[in-house]
From Swiss-Prot:
<dbReference type="GO" id="GO:0045948">
    <property type="term" value="P:positive regulation of translational initiation"/>
</dbReference>
<dbReference type="Pfam" id="PF04408">
    <property type="entry name" value="HA2_N"/>
</dbReference>
<feature type="coiled-coil region">
    <location>
        <begin position="492"/>
        <end position="519"/>
    </location>
</feature>
<keyword id="KW-0175">Coiled coil</keyword>
<feature type="compositionally biased region" description="Polar residues">
    <location>
        <begin position="189"/>
        <end position="201"/>
    </location>
</feature>
<dbReference type="Pfam" id="PF24385">
    <property type="entry name" value="DSRM_DHX29"/>
</dbReference>
<dbReference type="GO" id="GO:0016887">
    <property type="term" value="F:ATP hydrolysis activity"/>
</dbReference>
<feature type="short sequence motif" description="DEAH box">
    <location>
        <begin position="702"/>
        <end position="705"/>
    </location>
</feature>
<dbReference type="InterPro" id="IPR027417">
    <property type="entry name" value="P-loop_NTPase"/>
</dbReference>
<dbReference type="GO" id="GO:0022627">
    <property type="term" value="C:cytosolic small ribosomal subunit"/>
</dbReference>
<dbReference type="GO" id="GO:0004386">
    <property type="term" value="F:helicase activity"/>
</dbReference>
<dbReference type="GO" id="GO:0003723">
    <property type="term" value="F:RNA binding"/>
</dbReference>
<feature type="coiled-coil region">
    <location>
        <begin position="283"/>
        <end position="310"/>
    </location>
</feature>
<feature type="region of interest" description="Disordered">
    <location>
        <begin position="27"/>
        <end position="75"/>
    </location>
</feature>
<dbReference type="Pfam" id="PF24899">
    <property type="entry name" value="UBA_DHX29"/>
</dbReference>
<feature type="domain" description="Helicase C-terminal">
    <location>
        <begin position="849"/>
        <end position="1026"/>
    </location>
</feature>
<dbReference type="Pfam" id="PF00271">
    <property type="entry name" value="Helicase_C"/>
</dbReference>
């Protein structure tokens, strides 16, 4: 059956359909359109989207030269025009070495991946066809599927394998790697030749005719003819592509059918190319090349022969493949006169001659029917009517009777359009000419209305032959399909069998692994899971021998020190409750002790318990008491006090010491220690190693009323452990009356209430302080708030020299706010006080008023003769430092009459120890403290308390997913606690720096921390301890956090690669992060700093992130400070600028001593205290990383040494930036490049982040940065607009190595990170980065399994380090 039909595609799965579509038309536009069908909708670059849209636009004229990847299917050409999409290129030699490392790693780690149980032969076939559509070779496809599916891979894995393992010249078009100059090509539009020929009908036996070239034509003319033929084919294919693009009315069914004619044209062009190559190789006597070319020729001919048998193939396109047989001159036809040679059709005369030679029998039939048997239209009339209706512009069909001996057949010609003519001629012969015309009309209708049931409207005899043709076509199609797909189906069957066998082995292996799961791990990260609890037998544990400890305690009781302090202990309010406390603990496993501040519960309750366990021996087979404290300073000071009370001479952890302490990075305990004070975090880490606290007999949780995240988390775990351990006792100690909530949480356990030893405290509020001190609030004071101003219009008359009067309208600001706004309560105070109350800024701490108050205490008759310390509550270290400086520079406090002490957890222990010692008579001790002095520690001689009413809380903003340390007002409970600190030794006085009215508006209690902070670290601990999903676990909390907050925390952990995507399970990185008590992002940065040998500088940068920048900006000297910072700027990075300043400070300190150090700090506007703090925190972080098993390598050591005298090299800068990205991702944004018209004009750097646009903060060295690229930022803050603080310009490599979810878009030559960060890259390079991530994960996993393993000579880390350092070189 001949004729030309509309294009169809073969039905297949969606992904295969997309891949076939992508490979059909060899043009950039079609490539993009095809790939787009297989992708989920994601945010794409504007240029790529435009390119995709362009696939439906008409072809444009030749444009300027552009640079793109060498591919006719390359869609990245337009993307290359967008400079904001950065290109990624790797040195060729380094690329080959990296591929070698990747392949070597795969060989060494031959662990089979988990295979999906849903793989079927149909899915494997779809995958095979998808790869085939990309024009990969059959052998390569089979190798890829074998090497990926057996490892749990999919289509993308197979494409990755092919791109990684095939050489560039072996990759199909569209996957080429090299950049080349591309000139857009255009060909003249295809002009259709006039084809008129005798066409073989469908049931004709397959015969091949061979044409011979005239002997007179030379070889050169033959070659030119082949070139013209190839050009004609390409132009024909191009014309079809354009026609296809303009067909907007295609149905889905038509799109899913395969067109053999188009494939045949494509193969014909390739066949001619191969013949030219063969001829060239023959002249060059290149046997190997000639052999390969002949193989290609045979391959193309075999596929073309298969297509010739396709039921919808147009025989007019058929060409001869035989080279060795001479061709006969063709018989001239009408079409040949226009084209000079017949390209696509056989000579009808030649066909007749062959038939005669072979003497094949004719198929003669009688199609006669009577008027009685059929009253409808005849086939001929039906065809004429159909053409008139459906092709109104076409002439009526022509019928040409062809005699064959005494029989007839008919050639029917239907002109569908100027360049589309259908010519058919059945092979069946009839006895008369009219039947031949009806039969020809039936065949024409069969071709024109294929798939429709028109045959039911034809006479029975012609209806039968229609069905005969249809059945023969289906049968042939099935046979061809089976024959073509036989090798593929055989391969898929074998592969599916292997997959099933491996799946069974995996199931058996996992069952064996579960059976052996109780074997102990030789790792410091060994955990006790819920399943292992049943295996722990407490009864069989060795009973502790307490006799030596009891003897030691009896000996200590007889010492003078013990006896002396016993008398002091007996004066404490809690001491008279000793017996009731001990008895209650004997009867109940959980007890709540509610004692007021100063009652002595933190020291005495653990002491009572220890004494009773060691002396009375009440079922005491075990005596190990752990008392948790929220702060390090509390744990240390309480342990010191209890050691003194026990009579231990050598202090906590000393020889024969019964009491010790353990805080982060410091442990003071010995074999005889039976009472351990520790921070809550230390006990949580103990729970990671021993999920049941097997060696602990009593847990005391102090200061539970503070409701920190760690304490609430600890209570959930302890509640579950109590259900599994019948011998564990728990004591909760709270300083507030909110004890019922804790009792209810632990099934209504008993509450012991202990009143504090307190004296009456007189309270003065802000209005009283102003009235008594005579403080005057100046209008220009920084503490005076400015009200909104209203403008009043006035008319001003101005008299000129000539005597004329001009009128001007002016607007004069008028302040709003009046005394009527004050509460009537303040009417009893003076107008000066009322004015100050009205205008004083309540959100700013008035340090001037505090100085006036301190001076007033010494000159007022009411207070000057009262001895006692002054405790001032401030919100943070900055305010402490500021007030300390003011006191030091105020002449009124110069004398030895005053001793000023700053109390903060980051300050030295020696300075803080002075706060607890009594000063000499006549000396006023002034202690500056945060809320640490509220309940955690007790300063014994405090009589005066100055309460600013402010504190700092870490709050989480769900809308922006940002957290910040916010200064806020305290709760009523906290204010009362602060007030109570003044009544410890005598009648006290509390001065509140806020009004009585504001105090009444305070919240009763602070919001629990678990409800207002990010929960990443908490989720890490939950997964580390195998406590199930964080959502389920935290639902058991005293105050469960919102699910959205937990979800945000888990999303962040997934983004940084700390936990698995589909289950609450830690990755190797997450396991290591859980061992570091720091923010997860900083922890990740420290780990990568250690494994890449740059821990020292990274720890310095991490210390800055945990504290604050050392740069200062004095009032009135902003320009000087900015200039000094600019002089230290390095590598477009605020982080490296700070590190550069730190190096200079260390150099000045080492070479010139204190004076040189001070000069350097003043010249560069650096805070020396911040730098000293930074150094201390840095050393502490390094200790933490080493304690987690990451010892510093020789490379890391080289950063330390004499680094202060060196500058950073480009390679070192690249490495540091990469580690910064590893830690701070996904805090990245794309710089919106703005080209300024005026060169001198400085434009603020605008950055597009995942949440929207933001502006670089004015304090950043990148404030005026204008370039194409990406910016890393430390934090995002919102003032009048959103700003990015502490930014660094970064390159693509670190983002590709350490960023979020990476996706390779093979056809577009794009790499996407998290669906919105795009880079241009050849597919091979894209796959390399994807594989390198797997290798990094394997290094971390090995380190987890073997903590002592050295990473210094690891090949993977070495090659990645080299890759990072060589970027842009």
């Amino acid at each position: 059956m001949g004729g030309k039909n509309k294009k169809h595609k073969a039905p297949a799965a969606a992904v295969v359909r997309a891949a076939v579509s992508a490979s059909r038309a060899k043009s950039a536009e079609a490539g993009i359109a095809g790939e787009a069908q297989s992708k989920k909708p994601v945010s794409r670059p504007a240029t790529a989207a435009a390119a995709a849209a362009g696939s439906r636009e008409p072809r444009v004229k030749q444009g300027p030269k552009i640079y793109s990847f060498n591919s006719t299917n390359d869609s990245s050409g337009p993307a290359n025009l967008d400079k904001s999409i950065l290109k990624v290129v790797i040195n060729n030699k380094l690329e080959q070495r990296i591929i070698g490392v990747i392949n070597e790693h795969k060989k060494q780690n031959n662990d089979k991946g988990m295979i999906s149980g849903r793989l079927t032969a149909k899915k494997l076939q779809d995958l095979y066809m998808a790869l085939q559509a990309f024009s990969f070779k059959t052998k390569d496809i089979e190798d890829a599927m074998t090497n990926t599916l057996l490892y749990g891979g999919d289509l993308h894995s197979a494409l990755d394998w092919l791109c990684l393992n095939l050489s560039d010249d072996a990759l199909p078009e569209g996957f080429s790697q090299e950049f080349e100059e591309q000139q857009p090509k255009s060909r003249p539009k295809f002009q259709s030749p006039q084809i008129q020929a005798t066409i073989s009908p469908p049931l004709q036996p397959k015969t091949k005719t061979y044409e011979e070239d005239p002997k007179s034509k030379p070889k050169k003319e033959e070659k030119n003819m082949e070139v013209n033929m190839k050009e004609w084919i390409l132009r024909y294919a191009e014309q079809q592509n354009e026609e296809e693009k303009n067909e907007n009315s295609k149905s889905l069914e038509e799109e899913e059918k395969f067109d053999p004619n188009e494939r045949y044209l494509h193969l014909a062009a390739k066949l001619l190319d191969a013949k030219e190559q063969a001829a060239t190789f023959k002249l060059e006597k290149n046997k190997q090349g000639q052999k390969e070319a002949q193989e290609k020729i045979r391959k193309f001919q075999r596929e073309m022969e298969t297509l010739e048998d396709h039921p919808v193939f147009n025989p007019a396109m058929k060409i001869s493949h035989q080279q060795n047989e001479r061709k006969k001159p063709p018989v001239a036809t009408e079409g040949e006169s226009a084209l000079n040679f017949n390209l696509f059709e056989k000579s009808a005369a030649a066909t007749e001659e062959e038939k005669d030679k072979k003497k094949e029998p004719h198929d003669v039939r009688n199609f006669d029917y009577t008027a009685r048997s059929w009253t409808g239209k005849s086939p001929k009339q039906f065809l004429i009517d159909w053409v008139r209706k459906n092709l109104p512009k076409s002439p009526n069909p022509s019928f040409e009777k062809v005699p064959v001996g005494r029989y007839w057949k008919c050639r029917v010609r239907v002109i569908k359009s100027e360049d589309d003519v259908l010519v058919v001629c059945p092979t069946i012969l009839t006895e008369d000419g009219m039947q031949a015309q009806h039969l020809g009309a039936t065949l024409a209708l069969y071709r024109l209305v294929k798939g429709q049931s028109v045959h039911q409207l034809l006479p029975p005899t012609y209806r039968d032959v229609w069905l005969e043709w249809s059945d023969a076509e289906k049968k042939r199609e099935e046979l061809n399909k089976m024959e073509t797909n036989k090798p593929r189906d055989l391969f898929i069957a074998k592969l599916l069998n292997k997959l099933k066998q491996q799946q069974q082995q995996q199931q058996q292996h996992s069952e064996n692994k579960r059976e052996n799961s109780e074997d102990p791990e030789e790792s410091w990260e060994n955990l006790v899971s819920d399943e292992d609890f049943s295996a722990l037998s407490l009864e069989s544990a060795n009973v502790e021998d307490l006799e030596p400890v009891r003897n030691l305690f009896r000996k200590l009781q007889s010492t003078p020190k013990y006896q002396k302090l016993l008398k002091e202990r007996q004066q404490l309010p809690v001491f008279k409750h000793r017996d009731s406390i001990v008895e209650t603990l004997k009867r109940h496993r959980v007890v709540v002790v509610a004692g007021e501040t100063g009652s002595g519960k933190s020291t005495q309750v653990p002491h009572f318990l220890l004494e009773d366990l060691l002396l009375n021996e009440w079922e005491a087979s075990k005596c190990n008491i752990v008392c948790t404290q929220p702060r390090r300073i509390s744990a240390v000071s309480l342990a010191n006090r209890v050691c003194d009370e026990l009579g231990c001479e050598n202090g906590p952890g000393g020889r024969n010491s019964l009491c010790g302490y353990q805080i982060r990075m410091e442990s003071r305990a010995c074999e005889s220690t039976r009472l351990l004070y520790c921070t809550t975090g230390v006990l949580l880490r103990k729970l990671q190693e021993d999920g049941l606290l097997s060696n602990v007999s009593h847990v005391i949780v102090d200061e539970v009323h503070e409701r920190s995240v760690q304490s609430d988390f600890l209570l959930i775990i302890l509640k579950e452990i109590l259900q599994k351990r019948s011998d564990l006792h728990l004591i909760l100690m709270s300083a507030t009356v909110d004890s019922e909530k804790f009792s209810t949480y632990f099934t209504h356990c008993p509450i012991l209430r202990i009143s504090g030893r307190s004296y009456p405290v007189e309270v003065f509020h802000l209005e009283d302080i102003i009235e008594e001190t005579g403080f005057v609030l100046e209008k220009d004071s920084e503490y005076c708030q400015k009200f909104l101003e209203e403008e009043e219009e006035v008319t001003i008359n101005v008299t000129s020299k000539a005597g004329g009067i001009k009128k001007y309208q002016e607007y004069i600001p008028v302040q709003t706010g009046a005394h009527a706004d004050l509460n009537p309560f303040y009417q009893k105070y003076s107008s000066r006080t009322q004015h100050a109350i009205l205008y004083m800024n309540p959100h700013k701490i008035n340090l001037d008023l505090i100085l006036e108050l301190l001076a007033y205490l010494d000159k007022s008759p009411q207070f000057r003769n009262i001895e006692g310390a002054v405790l001032i509550f401030l919100p943070g270290l900055a305010h402490i430092q500021q007030l300390y400086d003011l006191l030091s520079n105020d002449r009124r406090f110069y004398s030895e009459r005053y001793k000023v002490i700053a109390l903060h957890s980051i300050l030295s222990t020696q300075d803080q120890a002075a706060a607890f010692t009594l000063p000499p008579p006549g000396v006023r001790k002034i202690v500056l403290a945060t809320n640490i002095a509220e309940t955690g520690i007790t300063i014994p001689d405090v009589v005066f308390v100055i309460d600013t009413g402010r504190t700092k809380e870490n709050k989480y903003h769900e809308s922006s997913q940002m957290s910040s340390l916010v200064e806020t007002f305290v709760s009523k409970a906290s204010a009362l606690q602060r007030q109570g600190r003044a009544g410890r030794v005598r009648d006290g006085f509390c001065f509140r720096m806020y009004t009585r009215e504001r105090f009444e508006g305070f919240m009763d209690y602070s919001v629990p921390e678990i409800l207002r902070v990010p929960l990443e670290e908490l989720c890490l601990h939950i997964m580390k301890c195998n406590l199930g999903s964080p959502e389920d676990f935290l639902s058991k909390a005293l105050d469960p956090p919102q699910l959205q907050v937990i979800s945000n925390a888990m999303n962040l952990l997934r983004k940084i690669g700390a936990c698995e995507l589909n289950e609450p399970k830690l990755t190797p990185l997450g396991q290591h992060l859980a061992a570091l008590p720091v923010n997860v992002k900083i922890g990740k940065m420290l780990i990568f700093g250690a494994i890449f040998g740059c821990l020292d500088p990274v720890a310095t940068l991490a210390a800055v992130m945990t504290e604050k920048s050392p740069f200062t900006t004095p009032i009135g000297r902003k320009d000087e400070a900015d200039l000094a910072k600019s002089a230290l700027a390095m590598a477009d990075s605020d982080h490296l600028t700070i590190y550069n300043a730190y190096l200079g400070w260390k150099k000045a300190r080492q070479e010139g001593g204190y004076r040189s150090e001070i000069t350097y700090c003043r010249r560069n506007f650096l805070n020396r205290t911040s730098l000293l703090t930074l150094e201390d925190v840095k050393q502490e972080l390094i200790k933490l990383v080493k304690a987690a098993g990451f010892s510093s390598s020789t490379t890391s050591t080289s950063w330390e040494g004499n680094r202060a005298s060196q500058t950073l090299s480009f390679q070192e800068i690249a490495l540091l930036k990469a580690v910064l990205v590893a830690g701070l991702y996904d805090n990245v944004g794309k710089i919106i490049y703005t080209k300024s018209v005026d060169v001198t004009e400085k434009l603020a750097c605008i950055v597009e982040t995942a949440q929207g646009k933001a502006q670089v903060h004015p304090s950043s060295v990148n404030r005026d940065l204008q370039t194409h690229g990406w910016l890393l930022y430390q934090e995002k803050i919102r003032y009048a607009r959103v700003y990015l603080r502490e930014t660094t310009l970064i390159t693509p490599f670190p983002v590709l190595l350490f960023g979020g979810d990476i996706e390779v878009q093979h056809r577009e030559r794009l790499l996407s990170i998290d669906g919105w960060i795009y880079f241009q890259a050849p597919v091979k390079i894209a796959v390399i980065f994807k594989q390198l991530r797997v290798l990094i994960d394997s290094v971390l996993r090995k380190k987890l399994e073997n903590p002592k393993m050295s990473l210094e000579n690891d090949k993977i880390l070495q090659i990645i380090t080299e890759l990072i350092k060589t970027e842009n070189n």
